[in-house]
């Protein structure tokens, strides 16, 4: 299955978060950093959005979500 990249409107729809909350969570280490799609476009791998949403739904504390985000970003780097 090919990885899907979600742009911000899709991320907002999938997560129920606003743009400012997505970027706040990135700064807090509670959301993965976006990947560059071009000079003025970014997106997030759909698998990362699904994993973070699942952790939130499961009631994981922020500490565990930060660890998940770190794991996801590390896996992203090693997949290249």
Which ranges hold each PLM region?
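A short, Lys/Arg-enriched interface patch at domain edges and termini
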Residues: 50-79
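Short, solvent-exposed alpha-helical "recognition" segments
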Residues: 28-35, 61
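PIN/NYN-family metal-dependent endoribonuclease catalytic core
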Residues: 45
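Short hydrophobic/aromatic patches at helix-to-coil boundaries
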Residues: 2, 79-80
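Polyanion-binding surface elements
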Residues: 1-28, 51-58
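Short Lys/Arg-enriched helix C-cap and helix-to-coil transition segments
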Residues: 35-41
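Intrinsic-disorder/low-complexity peptide segments enriched for small residues
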Residues: 4-6, 15, 35, 66, ...
